[in-house]
């Protein structure tokens, strides 16, 4: 099987194109496939806060594979064994949470690369990513098709942002607004003016360094603002929030005193 590995999400990032995404937290392949038919450029399959197992992530990757929407996997943390598993099931783009230092960034880069460039364990014959050993020269191709994104979501990470941006192998940096605002002393208040100022300057620093800048904004005006600041991969909703708000809104049509949509914050 002489297949050439490609990653359309990474290719568009490298061109500086804007890509609009959706957060998937419902943990089901059925819901993931519905989202994939909607036309979002990318879909974040969340393994950090949503209760996804490695099998759940695998099934959702299978569900979205026939469609143009590109999957991005966020594991619960960036350990070498977990990164290996997620890559083996076929993830090509990873979003790794809580990367605070350049050393951590270098460690996760190493975990995604096969020797001699890194420490990823070899198991192509049992990996969906290599079509169970049927993709010729998989190990030689895969480094170029992998896309590695890291989350900056603490004051420590902000202090180290320039050093993180200098790490070779990091393709983009995602600003985590909820955790970042809490770390800065404004819990549950990503809309605070000081937090907004820091988000804007961080996005501009990321883009000036030649990296992609990402953000999650469930409020449309915040999403538009981040796009104006230069963010080029922006998630504009969370499936569970959209679902619960749609349910509440429909019920409010028929029962008095019921609340309408609640989408206001960042996550």
UniProtKB/Swiss-Prot annotation:
Annotated Gene Ontology cellular component terms = cytoplasm
Q: Which reaction does it catalyse?
A: 2-dehydro-3-deoxy-L-rhamnonate = (S)-lactaldehyde + pyruvate
Against HAMAP family, the record matches this protein to: KDR_aldolase (MF_01290)
Instruction: Look up and give the organism this protein is from.
Output: Shigella dysenteriae serotype 1 (strain Sd197)
Supply the EC number(s). 4.1.2.53
What is the name listed in the Swiss-Prot or TrEMBL entry for this protein?
2-keto-3-deoxy-L-rhamnonate aldolase
User: Which cofactors, by name?
Assistant: Mg(2+)
The active site annotation covers: 49 (proton acceptor)
Query: Has UniProt tagged this entry with the keyword Metal-binding?
Result: yes
Tell me the residue numbers annotated for binding substrate: 151, 178-179
Assigned protein family? Belongs to the HpcH/HpaI aldolase family. KDR aldolase subfamily.
- Does the entry annotate any disulfide bonds, and if so which pairs? none
* Sequence positions that bind Mg(2+): 153, 179
